[in-house]
Amino acid sequence: MMAEKPENSLEKETGRLEAFSDGVFAVAITLLVIDLKVPTLKGPVTSQQLAEQLFSQWPSYVAFLISFATILIMWVNHHNMFKLVHKSDTTFLFANGFLLLLVTAVPFPTALVSEYLTSSAAVIACVVYCGLFAIINIAYNLLWWSAVNHHLLKPNVSHFIIRARTRSYLLGFPSYLLALVIAFWSPFVSITICALLWIFWSIASYEKTPMRLHQQDE
């Protein structure tokens, strides 16, 4: 029987953890759709009435799209991070669990924004929304920190990519904190910043700096 390649054996050690994480991301992103409700109108309903009711629910659509895109990008970044990791330890497992805990909470502030974005309570709804994503960014940095400082990365990952990833992950917290502060004056601007951030992260995920992995001897 042919000997198993070292790369394959390294990947198997984190395979279960990544599969479990993928399942949590999938559930969280699916739960977002629950807040999209079909309008209930009594009596004979005209197309105009239905259209007006559908349009009046625009905060729900905005919150759904932003949250869906954000969770999707979080999953992409999580997947990209695990491409660099070849083993785990207890700290890494708990850091990943903390991140997943926060990811499953995303539908709650999304529902708050959907319900109260056009009301006088919009400030609190947006503060909670931005605050959660700021904490999620802290969780991402903890996960990355544990991978780097506990020597869980693949041996051929260069210092260049480590520094590039670290800078990228550190950008999130001050950005969401800024959106949180702005929410006290303009909830709509705050939500706009969140939308711009997921656009930025999606572009950044495509423009990742080359990994510059050194080829291992076969």
Predicted features along the sequence, with ranges:
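Multi-pass alpha-helical transmembrane bundle typical of ion/small-solute transporters
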Residues: 2-218
